[in-house]
C-alpha cells in the first residue's frame, strides 16, 4: 500500500530521520515506539507531507513522490488526501461544535454535499460514542471526548491510511482506555493504521508490526511477540526495560 525508501529529514544541520525504509501493507497496524526526540513524530508527519522530507521516496499504490526532486504541490495534496491524521493535542476548531469539526474537511476541502456529509458525520460520532455530544463545543468536552472527535474528523475524509501521533499522551490516565478502544475497533474493522505510542500493552494487542526508532534510524522491527518478548537489539531491550520497569 505505502512504501518508504531512503527517507531523510533535517531541520537545519540537525538530521532527524536517516534513510528510513518501511512498508505499510493494506489492513495492517504498525506501532512506532521510541524515546523522546527519536524522530517518531517527524516520521509520521512525513508520511502525509505535513513535514517535507529532504530526500527519499514515498510510493502509494497508484503514484509515488521522489523528494530528492522538485515536488509538485498537486502530488503533496494527493498524498495528504490519502491519509487522516490524529494529533496529540486534538487540534479541534474551538469555535465549532463536535459535528461541525467532523464536517469541516469533507465540506470545505472536498467540496462535498453538506447534507450528505452531515449524515455521515453523525454516524461517525455515533461510531466513537459521541452522537449525544455532537452539538457541544470542544471546551465542553473532556480530553478523551475531544480526541474521539479528532478520530471521527480524520475518518470523515475517507482516508486509505490513518496516522495517530501519540493519541493518548495528553490524556488523564483514566481517559486513555476510551480512546484506545476506538482505535482497537478500527483495527478490527481492517483499517490501515500507523500509531506512534508509548502504550506497550496496546501495541502488543493490536499491532501487526512494531518499529523501534532511536536517533532517527529504525533500530529494530518485527511482530510484537518478537519485539516485546525477545528483542534482538540491546538498545531495544534497554528502552523496553525502562518503560516496563520504571522504578
From Swiss-Prot:
Known EC number: 7.4.2.-
Compartments, record wording: Cell membrane
Residues that, per the record, bind ATP: 34-41
Keyword ATP-binding: yes
InterPro entries reported in the protein's UniProt record: AAA+_ATPase, ABC_ATPase_HisP-typ, ABC_transporter-like_ATP-bd, ABC_transporter-like_CS, MetN_ABC_transporter-like, P-loop_NTPase
Gene: tcyC
CDD domains associated with the record: ABC_HisP_GlnQ
The name this protein goes by in its record: L-cystine import ATP-binding protein TcyC
Domain ABC transporter: 2-240
Chief localisation class: membrane
Family stated for the protein in its record: Belongs to the ABC transporter superfamily. L-cystine importer (TC 3.A.1.3.14) family.
Top-level taxonomy: Bacteria, Bacillati, Bacillota, Bacilli, Bacillales
